[in-house]
Amino acid sequence: MQNSLDLKPISHVNGTVCLPGSKSISNRVLLLSSIAKGTTCLTNLLNSHDTQHMLNALKKLGVRYNLSDDKKTCHVQGIGGPFHLSEAISLYLGNAGTAIRPLLSVLSLHKNNILLNGDDRMHERPIGDLVDALIQGGAVIEYKKNKGYPPICTKGGFLGGSIFLNGNISSQFLTSLLISTPLALKDTTIFIKGNLVSKPYIDITLNLIKIFGVNIEHDSYNVFYIKGKQQYKTPGKYTIEGDASSASYFLAAAAIKGGSVKVTGVGKKSIQGDIEFANILEKMGATIFWEDYSITCTRNKLNAIDLDMNHIPDAAMTVAILALFSKGTTIIRNIYNWRVKETDRLSAMTIELRKIGAIVEEGRDFLSISPPIFFQYSSIETYNDHRMAMCFSLISLSGVGVNILNPNCISKTFPSYFKDFLSISKI
């Protein structure tokens, strides 16, 4: 395993990048295909650690699938309903929040005895609000270590009914319930307490659920109404669009050191909220050209921005790097949920930005960033967080190089990132 990657100063970027499949969509449709009636052909599936954890879990749960040699096409034979297991099993899900959270709800639909576990960081990522919601619906769930965190064991028993869910920590909790509750024995009404974070990710979930034949109604994202005793049905074939969060690094590179860079796989017809990043780039001064399935960015002078970025928390990390190349002080607001991601991203971003000379103020839920007078060559700690590694690769566009520690952490979502980044770069 590579301990570090030294990126030399890059003088210019130009070219086209074909994006890998979206992580958020890949793991959602793998699960939906598994519990749907019929066989689904998934194309442009993301090949990464997170999707592999989901595939391994589904196989252990009895799902049959055929994965192509390049791991981008998968034929999934749906079981037509909840998972029924006659014996106790354990599922290891690494640090894949997009796997452990939706699986917990679906596995709570039927009498089971299933342990869901993960790596050390997963044991620090909260899941208590989701567990509380499932218990309200009749589920029997036990914490095996620390209350509110994995590992956890579900014994099943979820029926539905009225559920109150905190919405201010992670949208994945609601996504989990929205996927599982149509299969419950009773109708379910979900009442959201507080402000729902990352609403665009809920839109992804609702869109995909509809493609698999189920409609869910909601009242301005405050109350969700789900009919029980439904069945998901295969759409036959589904092509996963490119990962919009991953697009942000290449578009940002063009804004900083272009040339022009075109990303394919996302565009005007994307269902992912993170394409909003391109609009933010435009507000900062870059030139953006949209097509149905591509976005092109061309360099221009960048100005600082002050925005609430709760709706695009992943792509907001790239804005923190753009701040270093912009005139003025950039403020990224309402991003408390950075603290419960792969690492505490607010703290990690602050520490690493200061290493390279930036002036940073870290608040409970915001970052204020002013560019450095001089960029300093640094070794960047990635905290085993794929997005930290990809974000800080852009420091190589500053005129100084950068050393990325534990670069292999990108395997969580984008194993070929550095190869693709260097393919558009000129030293």
From Swiss-Prot:
Its EC number is 2.5.1.19. It catalyses: 3-phosphoshikimate + phosphoenolpyruvate = 5-O-(1-carboxyvinyl)-3-phosphoshikimate + phosphate. It comes from the Bacteria. It is an enzyme of class 2 (transferase). Its main location: cytoplasm. CDD domains: EPSP_synthase. Phosphoenolpyruvate binds at K23, G97, R125, Q172, R345, R387, K412. Belongs to the EPSP synthase family. This is 3-phosphoshikimate 1-carboxyvinyltransferase. It comes from Buchnera aphidicola subsp. Acyrthosiphon pisum (strain Tuc7).
